[in-house]
């Protein structure tokens, strides 16, 4: 098949473009994307420009799964029309009101939900099936047996299979290029790699029904006036990978009147950000070593302007992309930048043979190892890894200023290459490294302040950078064991805890053993640690013990963070957003009725701040999803 022109604007052959889009779509559905979502969307829009009646644009983009039973859907699972700018959204709203007026409807209600970036599926309570071609999909019910969690329970209809975003970023981002790649692998393969197994053991891969998603509701006028704020609010409340928002008409009679094409429902549109792309040339490749040892490529390119900024460096994510796509010195590449996002390698237009992949670490010269598409330096004492570990400590601890990466690099170069050495430094030591008098004083004071300022013990533990002990899991594990006791626990002790699987337990035991002396040394320095409440000491008689609790709005009796910590001490499971596992939604000031709608739909008890305080202080809550005193 002939290659496409290097510039999207130069593509003029709709049949060739359609063939490439089919190829790109097939790779994407198989969990092995050849180009990014943004680049794919730009190509689809180009096809729409040059051949608006092309068959590809009217067909649902199908996925296939070998050896899976085909299942017909009771109603079509179609794709979604897309809006990349405010004008497209305005035209959609205008069209809706025009169609609604034809049947005498003037009060049209719109809903906006996150557009999850996963694998679309349908759960009827008996069978979990993929979207397929929109009319028939594939039976993947065994995904639930593998460990995929149905949020809100079974039988809630259409939804998306996704990995929890925060978990992916903390534990898997250095092993998979995108969460969707892992999800498709879990669904399509009977043999799972260790990382995918661990994600399933940790209950971090979910089937999320669209009905359980956070949502906004309002008029078309409110949607157009507040679309950016609506989007930001939903992004903050959603811990799943997303590639936009979906705006839908809620009035069933308007939906029925507007109907659908063979490709999408006319009463629904996806709101997506359109990244700006440009073409440049690779001048050099810089290899950077991270805290975990991953050696990642940064492309030094001919300067170009994108989204109002001059781009000189572009991330290429991993060495595998350099090797496979020929993104070496002299290559012509397409770069994309969306808003303030770091510019990324989008596509290699003219490959280069000059893709020399380093065999040794660029910092310590230790032979590198391949881990899937990633290069890794196995040397724990590599200078770059040491610098990044120390920087990670101060960044996560969050109570000591002045220790940026440049300062840390100077400390390590001067021989202060461990936390033990740095925390023994005096003002004179900083002066000896040619820091100025004022900066030396500030650094010495910052060291002392970091010991005396209050810090949560889970944050202290997470700052050591132990694999599989990020902030969330550190908080979780310290609710079972005090920090001092944890250091002596084995993998058997850890695997017995809820939420910790075999692979994670082995990794944590290994990390605690390796860093045990450092952790004990730092504990002996007398940090002002705030202990995590132990589950064994929690008041099981508390009315919120074991309950899922979400706080929203501005609280009067204290900060939301303080109220969340107090709820945890009473045994509650404090959550970020309302789901089917939420029991109570506690609303402070400035929370409108629309924000409580999801809780009502899911049968969650909605309480005002005062009603919540009465509840935990021994009173009985009289509120229910149907009876809310303030809304």
From Swiss-Prot:
Q: What does this protein need as cofactor?
A: Mg(2+); Mn(2+)
Q: Which GO terms describe its molecular function?
A: DNA ligase (NAD+) activity; metal ion binding
Can you tell me which residues bind Zn(2+)?
A: 361, 364, 377, 382
Residue ranges occupied by any BRCT domain in the UniProt entry: 539-630
* Amino-acid positions noted as binding NAD(+) in the UniProt annotation, renumbered to this chain: 37-41, 79-80, 131, 160, 272
What sections of the protein cross the membrane? none
Q: Where is the active site?
A: 115 (n6-amp-lysine intermediate)
Which keywords describe this protein according to UniProt?
DNA damage, DNA repair, DNA replication, Ligase, Magnesium, Manganese, Metal-binding, NAD, Zinc
A Gene Ontology biological process noted in the UniProt record is: DNA repair
Keyword set includes Metal-binding: yes
- Which reaction does this chain catalyze? NAD(+) + (deoxyribonucleotide)n-3'-hydroxyl + 5'-phospho-(deoxyribonucleotide)m = (deoxyribonucleotide)n+m + AMP + beta-nicotinamide D-nucleotide
> What EC number is given for this enzyme?
6.5.1.2
Query: What family does this belong to?
Result: Belongs to the NAD-dependent DNA ligase family. LigA subfamily.
Q: What is this protein called?
A: DNA ligase
- Name the source organism: Desulfatibacillum aliphaticivorans
């Amino acid at each position: 098949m002939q290659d496409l022109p290097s510039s999207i604007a130069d593509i003029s052959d709709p049949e060739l473009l359609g063939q490439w889009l089919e190829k790109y779509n097939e790779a994407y559905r198989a969990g092995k994307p050849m180009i990014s979502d943004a680049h794919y969307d730009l190509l689809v829009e180009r096809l729409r420009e040059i051949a608006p009646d092309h068959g590809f644009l009217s067909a649902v983009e199908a996925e296939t799964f070998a050896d899976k039973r085909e299942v017909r859907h009771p109603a079509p699972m179609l794709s979604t029309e897309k809006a990349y700018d405010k004008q497209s959204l305005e035209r959609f709203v205008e069209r809706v009101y025009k169609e609604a007026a034809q049947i005498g409807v003037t009060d049209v209600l719109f809903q906006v939900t996150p557009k999850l970036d996963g694998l679309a599926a349908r759960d009827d309570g008996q069978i979990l099936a993929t979207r397929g071609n929109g009319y028939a999909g594939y039976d993947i019910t065994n995904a639930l047996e593998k460990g995929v969690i149905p949020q809100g329970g079974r039988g809630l209809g259409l939804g998306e299979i996704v990995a929890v975003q925060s978990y992916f970023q903390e534990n898997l981002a250095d092993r998979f290029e995108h969460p969707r790649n892992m999800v498709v692998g879990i669904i399509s393969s009977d043999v799972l790699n260790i990382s995918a197994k661990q994600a399933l053991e940790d209950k971090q891969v979910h089937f999320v029904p669209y009905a359980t998603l956070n949502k906004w509701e309002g008029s078309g006028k409110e949607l157009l006036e507040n679309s950016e704020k609506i989007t930001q609010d939903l992004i903050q409340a959603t811990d799943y990978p997303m590639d936009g928002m979906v705006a839908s008409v809620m009035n069933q009679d308007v939906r029925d009147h507007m109907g659908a094409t063979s490709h999408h429902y006319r009463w629904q549109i996806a709101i997506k950000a359109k990244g700006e792309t440009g073409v440049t040339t690779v001048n050099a490749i810089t290899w950077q070593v991270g805290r975990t040892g991953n050696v990642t490529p940064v492309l030094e390119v001919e300067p170009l302007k994108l989204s109002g900024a001059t781009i000189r460096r572009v991330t290429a994510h991993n060495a595998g992309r350099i090797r496979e796509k020929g993104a070496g010195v002299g290559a012509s590449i397409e770069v994309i930048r969306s808003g303030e996002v770091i510019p990324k390698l989008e596509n290699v237009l003219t490959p280069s043979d000059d893709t020399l992949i380093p065999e040794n670490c660029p910092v310590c010269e230790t032979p590198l190892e391949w881990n899937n598409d990633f290069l890794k330096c196995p040397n724990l004492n590599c200078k770059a890894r040491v610098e990044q570990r120390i920087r990670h400590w101060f960044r996560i601890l969050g109570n000591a200023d002045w220790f940026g990466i440049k300062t840390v690099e100077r400390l390590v170069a001067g021989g202060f290459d461990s936390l033990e050495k740095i925390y023994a430094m005096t003002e004179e030591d900083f002066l000896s490294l040619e820091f100025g008098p004022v900066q030396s004083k500030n650094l010495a004071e910052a060291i002392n302040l970091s010991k005396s300022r209050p810090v949560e013990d889970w944050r202290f533990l997470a700052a050591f950078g132990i694999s599989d002990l990020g902030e969330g899991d550190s908080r979780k594990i310290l609710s079972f064991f005090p920090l001092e006791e944890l250091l002596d626990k084995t993998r058997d002790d850890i695997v017995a805890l809820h939420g910790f699987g075999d692979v994670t337990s082995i990794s944590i035991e290994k990390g605690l053993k390796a860093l045990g002396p450092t952790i004990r040394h730092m504990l002996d320095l007398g940090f002002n640690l705030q202990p995590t409440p132990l589950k064994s000491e929690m008041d099981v008689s508390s009315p919120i013990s074991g309950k899922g609790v979400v706080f929203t709005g501005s609280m009067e009796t204290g900060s939301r963070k303080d109220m969340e910590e107090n709820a945890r001490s009473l045994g509650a499971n404090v959550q970020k957003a309302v789901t089917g596992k939420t029991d109570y939604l506690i609303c402070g000031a400035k929370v409108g009725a629309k924000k409580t709608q999801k809780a009502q739909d899911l049968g969650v008890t909605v309480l005002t701040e005062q009603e919540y305080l009465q509840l935990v202080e021994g009173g009985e809550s009289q509120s229910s999803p149907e009876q809310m005193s303030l809304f």
